[in-house]
């Protein structure tokens, strides 16, 4: 969005209080765009001058429409979602209310208020569900809904289809039609990222990161927050008439374009904070079985004790099964060019916030967790073998 071309353009960002939404808002603000951040929670950072924050819930249509009062919004970036990882992934009702119901409300508000462009932040998971994918592209079919191992991925798939199907629908105000597209990012990282990296660092500091798993040759992808910001701005531009609406109705995979083994990707973070990278490697099936048992335990006990699962089945797939995608369509149609980044910024951020190994800080914890890892392996093996033993008796 060139500030000389559209200095008075206004955009609204759902999920604008989160890590990526806030970063996108700041980037657009620097380009001279009027930015409205819409979220159920305030940003952790100070809101820069020129950016407006509105507290609201995408599950409430009136909240959304109130955010449009008195302004002509040219583009909505619909980022808000729920249930991406950890225990959130197991709250099916809330996931559906936000990811599907919230998206319905956003689409309805865009039509009523005459918003001409909508960029939806989707996920790799609308296509991936545990199957190996090498250099896949946008021609791949959606994963059938019943094959998704988690409700987040299932609802994101439903929502993406709704967004792309809404492309070309008539606007009730101002004439014209709604142009939509969907970006499917890999896992997001960057300095100050609030979801994945803090959880990983917490596991490292507690001595839980004692093993890796799966094929050491398996490859996955990540996307730096600033590359994802670039992609969203380009996608919004590509929905305009002067770009021939080239992105209208289209999905795009977005990543850094550098497939890498999941655990090797995080090695600089582990070692950069002064910890030893684990040498023990466990089978993927063993960890998947453990994740399944953990989910079942949470299903039974979650209402009494909403504990944080060590891993979910989807997280095991995402980290241990090869899946990466071509960026050719995003390059050709959006002009997307991934810039090179690594985890060094994140390492420095964590160090600046008091993280890092201190001499002797982990030794006793590590002995305890080594014992728990052995117990985990024995438990899963017993649960796995018990039915066979009973049948053979």
From Swiss-Prot:
It is a multi-pass membrane protein. It comes from Bos taurus. It holds the Pfam family 3Beta_HSD. The chain crosses the membrane at residues 282-302, 371-391. NAD(+) binds at residue 156. GO terms for biological process: steroid biosynthetic process. The active site is at 152 (proton acceptor). Its EC number is 1.1.1.-. One of its GO terms (molecular function) is oxidoreductase activity, acting on the CH-OH group of donors, NAD or NADP as acceptor. It is found in: Membrane. One of its GO terms (cellular component) is membrane. It comes from the Eukaryota. This is Short-chain dehydrogenase/reductase family 42E member 1. InterPro entries: 3Beta_OHSteriod_DH/Estase (IPR002225), Lipid_A_modif_metabolic_enz (IPR050177), NAD(P)-bd_dom_sf (IPR036291).
């Amino acid at each position: 969005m060139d500030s000389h071309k559209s200095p008075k353009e206004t955009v609204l960002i759902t999920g604008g209080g989160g890590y990526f939404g806030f970063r996108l808002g700041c980037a657009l603000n620097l380009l001279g765009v009027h930015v409205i951040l819409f979220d159920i929670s305030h940003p952790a950072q100070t809101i820069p001058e020129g950016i407006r924050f509105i507290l609201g819930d995408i599950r409430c249509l009136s909240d959304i429409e109130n955010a449009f009062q008195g302004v002509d919004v040219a583009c909505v970036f619909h980022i808000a979602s729920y249930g991406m990882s950890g225990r959130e992934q197991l709250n099916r009702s809330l996931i559906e209310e936000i990811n599907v119901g919230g998206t319905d409300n956003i689409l309805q508000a865009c039509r009523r208020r005459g918003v001409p462009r909508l960029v939806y932040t989707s996920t790799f998971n609308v296509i991936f569900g545990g199957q190996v994918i090498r250099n896949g592209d946008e021609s791949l079919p959606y994963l059938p809904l019943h094959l998704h191992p988690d409700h987040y991925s299932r609802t994101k798939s439903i929502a993406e289809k709704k967004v792309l199907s809404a492309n070309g629908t008539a606007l009730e105000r101002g004439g014209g039609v709604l142009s939509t597209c969907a970006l499917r990012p890999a896992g997001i990282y960057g300095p100050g990222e609030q979801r994945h990296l803090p959880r990983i660092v917490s596991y490292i500091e507690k001595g839980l990161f004692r093993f890796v798993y799966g094929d050491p040759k398996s490859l996955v992808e990540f996307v730096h927050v600033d590359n994802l910001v670039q992609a969203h701005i380009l996608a919004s531009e590509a929905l305009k008439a002067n770009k021939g609406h080239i992105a209208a109705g289209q999905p795009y995979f977005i990543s850094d374009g550098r497939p890498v083994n999941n655990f090797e990707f995080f090695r600089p973070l582990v070692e950069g904070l002064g910890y030893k990278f684990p040498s023990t490697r466990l089978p993927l099936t063993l960890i998947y079985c453990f994740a399944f048992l953990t989910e079942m335990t949470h299903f039974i006990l979650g209402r009494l004790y909403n504990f944080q699962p060590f891993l979910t089945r989807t997280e095991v797939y995402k980290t241990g099964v090869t899946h990466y995608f071509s960026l050719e369509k995003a390059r050709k149609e959006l002009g997307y060019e991934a810039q090179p980044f690594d985890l060094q910024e994140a390492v420095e951020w964590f160090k600046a916030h008091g993280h890092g190994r201190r001499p002797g800080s982990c030794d006793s914890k590590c002995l305890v967790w080594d014992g728990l890892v052995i117990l985990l392996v024995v438990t899963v093996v017993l649960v796995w073998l018990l039915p066979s033993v009973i049948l053979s008796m």
